[in-house]
């Protein structure tokens, strides 16, 4: 019999406290049933004109209309078209002992099913993955190769999931329960 012992060292950043989610895996996977990741957190080649070369979240492969859920209990703090993020829903975590924690769900369906100020519970459906193309958005500067306006900096439907602790973007895979794998 072979026994493996793993020791993990978590680098401490003076601006970020390590939250209990890291140890307990309390945050739910945001896109139930969809575990493929098209783009990871960190440096990358920009997939489309106007997209950042530093990816501030993860892109989960999910078809248009797929539901996404609240990863934690909290309050919807923003809904709107957010440049490269397209239609975005932001959830502010109710857990305040570790500072302010926000989760962004980008490239959402424009027919948002929650409202700003609404309290939601972990696991509650709060939106759907949106279409690649959206029309009638004033100030949208993102277009596909055919000149059609897109839902932010995107090449197709997917859920971009981002996480900020005290305003600093962090890799969501360090905190999510499934880490993109079916258990």
Residue ranges and their predicted role:
Residues 112-120, 124, 167:
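Acidic, glycine-anchored pre-beta loop/turn
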Residues 1-2:
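Cationic-aromatic interfacial patches
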Residues 61, 92-94, 164:
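A generic structural motif
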Residues 118, 139-183:
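Acidic, glycine-rich catalytic/binding loops that coordinate metals and/or anionic ligands
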Residues 5-87, 96-99, 122, 132:
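Surface-exposed, glycine-biased beta-strand/turn segments
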Residues 53, 70-112, 116, 133-151, ...:
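Zn2+-dependent peptidoglycan hydrolase active-site motif and core
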């Amino acid at each position: 019999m072979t026994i493996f012992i793993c020791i993990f060292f978590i680098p401490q950043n003076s601006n970020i406290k390590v939250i209990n989610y890291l140890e307990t895996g309390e945050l739910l996977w945001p896109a139930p049933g969809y575990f493929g990741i098209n783009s990871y957190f960190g440096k990358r080649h920009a997939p489309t004109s106007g997209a950042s070369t530093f990816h501030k979240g993860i892109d989960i492969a999910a078809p248009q209309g797929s539901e996404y859920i609240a990863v934690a209990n909290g309050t919807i703090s923003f809904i709107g078209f957010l440049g490269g993020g397209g239609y975005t829903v932001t959830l502010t975590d109710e857990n305040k002992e570790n500072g302010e924690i926000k989760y962004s769900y980008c490239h959402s369906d424009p027919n948002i099913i929650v409202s700003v100020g609404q309290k939601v519970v972990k696991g509650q459906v709060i939106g759907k993955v949106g279409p690649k193309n959206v029309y009638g958005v004033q100030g949208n500067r993102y277009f596909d190769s055919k000149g059609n306006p897109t839902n932010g900096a995107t090449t197709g439907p997917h859920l971009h999931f981002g996480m900020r602790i005290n305003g600093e973007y962090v890799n969501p895979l360090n905190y999510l329960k499934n880490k993109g794998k079916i258990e």
